[in-house]
Design a protein with these regions (language model features):
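Contiguous hydrophobic, helix-prone segments at protein termini
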Residues: 1-244
Length: 244
């Protein structure tokens, strides 16, 4: 069982770039489809139900599933990172340095939230318009209620998994890590491992950011049709999508 588990772990880490690339293709398709859907909605609100239902299925396959895959990888990555800390390969300070080095969407949010000029505020809104305290709660108002395509210009960068990790550990720490991997008979090198760890944790957060944009827009579209039919938001749980 242990040998089988090691083999699965090795395969997951050594081939993660190809797997992550395929996951990202689904997320990119979802985001592009979201933008196209909003354009259709703005042009023709009457004959829209079929497109809406198709897109809701796409959210499952190209949003929720990719996020779940990244969440699973992030769980493995965090376990590995914790094992390095427990085995004194890295100390708590270095552990935090690795986590703080991640260019997650939260890093972008914090950077933009401090900026003041009109262009930067517009860029902030384009990225984070969809946020609401309860991601899946239709009753809670989001950052901006306007339903617009809001395309992301740097989508590839948000989903990038080629992290600059050479500076994170000292040569002594790298040597200790490679010895630890060899001792545990894992055919993985430091570069591949640390890139997998940082990419997995980063992309868990960034993939959720992508698919919740679609969730948020779907909720706003449902609210639009509910208002058209004088359906109260609190009553929406009693309706199927065909009834709205």
């Amino acid at each position: 069982y242990i040998d089988s588990l090691k083999e699965i772990t090795e395969n997951q880490i050594n081939n993660f770039q190809e797997k992550f690339h395929n996951i990202n293709k689904k997320l990119i398709k979802l985001e592009n489809s979201r933008s196209s859907l909003i354009k259709k909605f703005r042009n023709n609100k009457k004959n829209f139900l079929i497109d809406l239902k198709k897109f809701m299925n796409l959210i499952k396959s190209n949003g929720i599933v990719p996020f779940a895959q990244y969440a699973r990888n992030a769980f493995i990555a965090k376990k590995l990172l914790n094992s390095f800390l427990d085995n004194k390969i890295i100390d708590k300070k270095k552990y935090n340095k690795i986590l703080n080095s991640l260019e997650t969407i939260t890093t972008t949010y914090l950077k933009y939230s401090k900026l003041k000029n009109k262009k930067e505020k517009s860029e902030f809104l384009n990225l984070f318009y969809h946020l609401r305290p309860g991601t899946y709660d239709i009753n809670i108002r989001r950052q901006n209620k306007k339903i617009l395509p809001r395309e992301i210009g740097n989508l590839d960068l948000i989903l990038n998994f080629n992290n600059k990790v050479n500076h994170l550990l000292t040569s002594k720490e790298i040597k200790k890590m490679n010895s630890f991997l060899k001792k545990n008979q894992l055919s993985i090198n430091y570069d591949q491992l640390i890139n997998y760890v940082t990419s997995s944790i980063k992309l868990r957060e960034n993939s959720k950011f992508i698919f919740t944009r679609s969730i948020s827009d779907i909720l706003e579209i449902i609210k639009f049709y509910a208002k058209e039919k004088n359906i109260k938001l609190n009553d929406l749980n009693n309706y199927k999508i065909d009834q709205i």
